[in-house]
């Protein structure tokens, strides 16, 4: 079992627990996803981000 440090999105405190001991909110893993040059979903993620931010793609 690997412990990953987690962060509370409400109060910003770090903990190893799934529930924040200070405010009781559900915590999120503080580590970014692992990088891979052969990312199979990278194009979809970039396309979604462009749509959300309203960025036009040059061709």
UniProtKB/Swiss-Prot annotation:
One of its GO terms (cellular component) is ribonucleoprotein complex. One of its GO terms (biological process) is pseudouridine synthesis. The keyword Ribonucleoprotein applies. Pfam families: Nop10p (PF04135). Keywords: Ribonucleoprotein, Ribosome biogenesis, rRNA processing. InterPro entries: H/ACA_rnp_Nop10 (IPR007264), H/ACA_rnp_Nop10_sf (IPR036756), Nop10_arc-typ (IPR023532). GO terms for molecular function: snoRNA binding. HAMAP family: Nop10. Belongs to the NOP10 family. PANTHER family: H_ACA RIBONUCLEOPROTEIN COMPLEX SUBUNIT 3 (PTHR13305:SF0), RIBOSOME BIOGENESIS PROTEIN NOP10 (PTHR13305). Involved in ribosome biogenesis; more specifically in 18S rRNA pseudouridylation and in cleavage of pre-rRNA. This is Ribosome biogenesis protein Nop10.
């Amino acid at each position: 079992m690997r412990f990953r440090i987690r962060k509370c999105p409400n109060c910003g405190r770090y903990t190893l627990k799934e529930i924040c001991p200070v405010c009781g909110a559900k915590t999120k893993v503080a580590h970014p996803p692992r990088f891979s040059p052969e990312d199979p979903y990278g194009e979809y993620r970039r396309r979604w981000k462009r749509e959300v931010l309203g960025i036009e793609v040059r061709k």
